[in-house]
């Protein structure tokens, strides 16, 4: 049985931990409000731009000389995967879900005979992939570190992907990220960025095309909008991931704070029982000694 001194030390240690987790929960909650607002504001814009460019792509998909961001390289051999994780832990299953989804995707593509390249974003994903797939990593990108995500980060990554595509370093690019649903739920999502997915059905394409009028022509618009769309989609996924990280961290720290409270209650009960037992034993010894005299 632990001594009273040991129990007091353990209670003090758990109380200190509870203060830390409670503070981290409040910080995550404050960051979550901003991150959630930014992610939700970006969704309609990113979705509308994706639909518009899919419409544009559908109208010209049979023409020659299309941009590689739309038509691809004509091959489906080398797949570049961009898993988005956080730089820091203490976020529940946030990073583990992305790592598991990425690993499953890698194995599925390899089973199909594809060549895999990895460009992880965030330290946690990079560290995980280095342990299992170090030979597939071409480079890694630092995450936001819990700070607000600037559009310049997405623009820089988009330009880098465009340059890699032009050099023939990959044929297909897919991002793996956590889509923010609510504080308690984030969904690991795979989204193909390059080449742009366009409708294959002429009826669907023409039906959606009735909502748009393009000026200037489709080809000129594609040349200018495709790079911008890539940056916008990357930015939207970064915002979703940032909101998901703060939501997962807030939930994890709330659970940790609750568990610490329960642990304190259990330790306090044990402490009181031990103290009571010690007092009882001392009284018995005193009474026994008095009777012996």
UniProtKB/Swiss-Prot annotation:
Keywords: ATP synthesis, Cell inner membrane, Cell membrane, CF(1), Hydrogen ion transport, Ion transport, Membrane, Transport. It is a peripheral membrane protein. One of its GO terms (biological process) is proton motive force-driven plasma membrane ATP synthesis. GO terms for molecular function: ATP binding; proton-transporting ATP synthase activity, rotational mechanism. It is found in: Cell inner membrane. The keyword Cell membrane applies. It comes from the Bacteria. One of its GO terms (cellular component) is proton-transporting ATP synthase complex. NCBIfam families: ATPsyn_F1gamma (TIGR01146), PRK05621.1-4 (NF004146). Belongs to the ATPase gamma chain family. Produces ATP from ADP in the presence of a proton gradient across the membrane. The gamma chain is believed to be important in regulating ATPase activity and the flow of protons through the CF(0) complex. F-type ATPases have 2 components, CF(1) - the catalytic core - and CF(0) - the membrane proton channel. CF(1) has five subunits: alpha(3), beta(3), gamma(1), delta(1), epsilon(1). CF(0) has three main subunits: a, b and c. HAMAP family: ATP_synth_gamma_bact. This is ATP synthase gamma chain. It comes from Gluconacetobacter diazotrophicus (strain ATCC 49037 / DSM 5601 / CCUG 37298 / CIP 103539 / LMG 7603 / PAl5).
